[in-house]
A protein has these predicted regions:
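Generic protein-terminus/edge-of-domain signal
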Residues: 1-75, 82, 90, 111-118, ...
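Regular secondary-structure segments
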Residues: 55, 138-149, 194, 198-201, ...
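Basic/polar phosphate-binding segments, predominantly the helix-turn-helix DNA-binding elements
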Residues: 196-200, 204-242, 250, 254, ...
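A hydrophobic/aromatic-rich effector-binding and dimerization subdomain
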Residues: 2-33, 80-149, 167-176
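Acidic-residue sensor for enzyme active/binding pockets
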Residues: 50, 147, 243
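Short, Lys/Arg-enriched, Trp-marked, Pro/Gly-tolerant hinge/linker segments that flank
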Residues: 122-134, 148-161, 167-199, 203, ...
Length: 298
């Protein structure tokens, strides 16, 4: 494959087409209006970063184990494989921008501003952009959107430029943290349950035990949890355990079986099947690919 690419002249139509395809695969910007009737079928996650900017209206977003209420001017930063779901409220339709991009863009940004600089941007998932600066953020999303539709070899350069301007703005925009809007009672109960699961996922949790922590019957809790999160109790617990396992695969020398047991799975075979279903590769393949990528980035 590499030899074939070497034979393409840099100024040839084939090279331009290849560059354009790569940009489309690496970076996508979407602007959409969402009515109350729109709803994600269930929470999802993806192997790339996402910046979500709410232009108008309001919505409710569940991320990992926390519920956020968003209003116009709020921006949310999502890292790869963060579970999330958006629900839109009553009233006027909401309008939002999303920018999705592969980790290589973030890795390059971090190499220029330090890991601490990057961490400060993603340390709090939601940021309220001051009203007088919302048009600036909107314009950056518009410019990125235009570049994803461009067919020349400069698109990637421009995309990096606009994205890095946006990330720099977000990093500098972080002043004293403002308290989040208080959750309504039902959402507060579900968030408490999700956070309990997140904290205790390595233990042999049961639906009955978690329902007891929020003072609900198992049947009622199961219905409320699924309605609010979009996943059943067992599905959500498995997702949390798999994300912990993925981190341990890349950061420890524990065996696959040891990791499975550490994260709360009853046996290695079930863990392997669940991991492959979620990630598309086995735990061992994931560990190997992660280590190879780390070596390539040195």
């Amino acid at each position: 494959m590499k030899e074939k690419n070497k034979m393409i002249k840099k100024d040839s139509p084939a090279a331009s087409e290849a560059a354009c395809r790569n940009v489309v695969n690496e970076f996508m910007v979407e602007r959409a209006r969402r009515a109350q009737s729109f709803a994600m079928e269930k929470p999802h996650y993806h192997p790339y970063y996402e910046l979500y900017f709410l232009i108008s209206g309001s919505c409710r977003m569940f991320i990992d184990h926390t519920i956020y209420y968003l209003s116009a001017g709020d921006i949310v930063m999502l890292a790869p494989y963060q579970l999330h779901q958006t629900l839109y409220g009553s009233g006027q339709p909401a309008e939002r921008f999303t920018a999705n991009f592969v980790p290589v863009y973030i890795e390059y940004f971090a190499s220029q501003c330090s890991e601490d600089g990057l961490a400060s941007i993603f340390s709090k998932r939601k940021l309220s952009v001051p009203k007088e600066q919302q048009n600036y953020v909107k314009e950056l999303f518009l410019q990125m959107s235009k570049e994803t539709l461009s067919s020349d070899c400069y698109s990637r350069i421009q995309l990096k430029s606009f994205l890095f301007q946006l990330l720099t703005f977000l990093g500098r925009c972080r002043g004293p943290e403002q308290p989040d809007q208080a959750l309504d009672p039902d959402d507060a109960v579900i968030q408490n349950a999700a956070q309990y699961i997140y904290t205790h996922h390595s233990e042999p949790l049961t639906l009955e035990a978690v329902a007891k922590t929020v003072h609900m019957s198992p049947a009622w809790f199961s219905r409320k949890f699924h309605r609010a999160v979009g996943l059943g109790f067992k599905e959500y617990l498995t997702h949390v355990r798999l994300e912990d396992a993925a981190e341990l695969l890349l950061t420890t020398s524990l065996s696959v079986t040891e990791i499975a047991l550490t994260c709360g799975f009853s046996n290695g075979n079930y863990f392997g099947d669940a991991f492959k279903k979620a990630r598309g590769i086995s735990p061992r393949e994931f560990r190997f690919s992660g280590h190879v990528q780390a070596e390539d980035n040195r």
